[in-house]
Amino acid sequence: MHGILPLWKPKGLTSHDCVMRCRRYFKTKKVGHTGTLDPEVEGVLPICIGQATKIVPFLTDTKKVYEATVQLGYSTETEDATGKIVETKEVSDFPTNKNLEEVLQTFIGRTKQIPPMYSAVKVNGKKLYEYARANESVERPVREIEIFELTLTSVDEKNHSFDIRIVCSKGTYIRTLCVDIGKALGYPAHMSLLTRTKTGAFSEKNTVTFDMIEEAVSNQSEERLLEPIINGLQHLEQIEVNEDMEKRILNGQKLSLQRNQPKQTDPFVFVREGNVLAIYQSHPTNEDQIKPVRVFAIEDKKV
C-alpha cells in the first residue's frame, strides 16, 4: 500500500502523534509527515505511506498557505496564545486598514528570520525548546525564508486583532512573523490562532479526518483515501518516457543528455503512463549526465 494521505490534523495532537496513528491504521512502519504542525494548530498535513515516504523531503519543500490571527497588545514567551505573557502595551490607537496593509507589504519577499526559542529547531544536537525549558540561553540560527503573499483578510478592532493569509516557503515560523508585524506596528504581539490551509497541491477541501479514516478501516477501504505519489510531485517538472527508457530508469541508471537537449529543472520526475518512476537531477560532476535521487518500484501500478 503506497500513497499520500491528505490528513486534516486536529488540534491537540502532535504531528508525530498523527504518524503513529497512521502506522496503526495502515499497518506499516513506513509512514512520515511532510512538515511539523504545533499541537494547538490544525490544518493540512500530508502523510506519506509506503514508497511515498521517499518524497517526504520534496513535499516538505513546497509552498505552504496559512491563515493566522495577530493579537496586538501583549507578547508571550512562546509567541502564541499558550505562553506566559512577557510584555504588554495598551492599544490606544488601533492601526487603520491602510496602515495594516502597508506594513504587511514590507514583509513580502526573501528575508531572514530567527526561529522562536520554543521550537524544534536543533542547535548543537539539542532542540531550542529544551534550552528554553531549562532556562538556558543559546545563539539561534538565522534562516532565510520567503513570503510570497501576505494579505489582510479581516479586522477586529474591538479586540485589537486582525487576520492574515500567508503564502510562504518551508521553515517559516508564522508565530515569529506575527510578532515582527506587531513590532512594525509599534506594539507587542503574538499569534493567537493558526490554520494551515494548503501544502503543495493538497488543500483543505481535499483532506480527510481521523473519523473518516476509522470508518474506512472498519470497511477495509482505507487504501481509497490515498492519493497517488505523483500528486505530491506536481511542483516538479514531469517527463513522460517510453518502455525502453522505463527499464533503465527503474534500474537506477545514470542517463546521458542528448545533444542539444535542454537541461531540465532540478529535480525532475520521470513518469510512464501516469505512474512516477523516479526523481532525477543533474550529475554533480558530469554536466552531460543526470542521476537518480529516488527510484520507485512499480508493484501494482498505483504509485
Swiss-Prot record:
InterPro entries named among the record's database cross-references: PsdUridine_synth_cat_dom_sf, PsdUridine_synth_N, tRNA_psdUridine_synth_TruB, TruB_C
Gene Ontology molecular function: RNA binding; tRNA pseudouridine(55) synthase activity
Lineage top rank: taxon: Bacteria
Pfam families assigned to the protein according to its UniProt record, in alphabetical order: TruB_C_2, TruB_N
Enzyme class: isomerase
Keyword annotations of the record: Isomerase, tRNA processing
CDD domains: PseudoU_synth_EcTruB
GO biological process: mRNA pseudouridine synthesis; tRNA pseudouridine synthesis
List of catalytic residues: D38 (nucleophile)
Gene3D superfamilies the UniProt entry points to: Pseudouridine synthase (3.30.2350.10)
Keyword Isomerase annotated: yes
Keyword Ribosomal protein: no
Catalytic reaction annotation: uridine(55) in tRNA = pseudouridine(55) in tRNA
EC number, UniProt record: 5.4.99.25
Its biological purpose: Responsible for synthesis of pseudouridine from uracil-55 in the psi GC loop of transfer RNAs.
NCBIfam families named in the record: TruB (TIGR00431)
Sequence similarity: Belongs to the pseudouridine synthase TruB family. Type 1 subfamily.
Designated name of the protein: tRNA pseudouridine synthase B
Organism (species): Oceanobacillus iheyensis (strain DSM 14371 / CIP 107618 / JCM 11309 / KCTC 3954 / HTE831)
